[in-house]
Amino acid sequence: NTMAPTAKGTIIDNELIPHVIKSIAAKDDITAVKIVSSRMLLATGFLRKVFEIFETFNTSIDMVTTSEVGVSLSIDNKMHLTQIVEELKKYGTVVVEENMCIICVVGDLRWMNVGCESCITAALHDIPIRMISFGGSDHNISFLVREVDKKEALQALSYHLFSPKCDGSKAFEKSKSCKRSCLKSKL
């Protein structure tokens, strides 16, 4: 518990324990911005132009995902959102979703730990996920969900990753690697 690091039962350290999920964190008041543009397909410099708009308005980007014709990202500063959206509209259709939340699972998530990310994602099987960010770090996977789904998402992750009642069978009974990951997370 980062709000009570000295509380009984709480252990916070930076030691890497192989195959173990260490914590779950959440960040509220996030805004998702999605830009869809057929001009992005095979276009050089499109992302640079998008990022320059955010830089111009001194607005940091928390998460980003891309596809052939679109980019989705999240920000936690809406001060210049109107101006940013107007600039982005020059490049395509812009959709803004407010009242979002980033949920981050932290631990040993190296790509060779097969099944860990699927175990985490399976725990959220009833939660609408807007965006997933994974691969930029070996230590976390982040999900963008609606703030109204935050409590349910945190409870599901906590139960499936840390609860002594969890035998790895709830949302992912057929995955041996999920069972293994869930059980190891309780160390």
What are these regions (language model features)?
Residues 1-136, 140-187:
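C-terminal catalytic "cap/lid" subdomain
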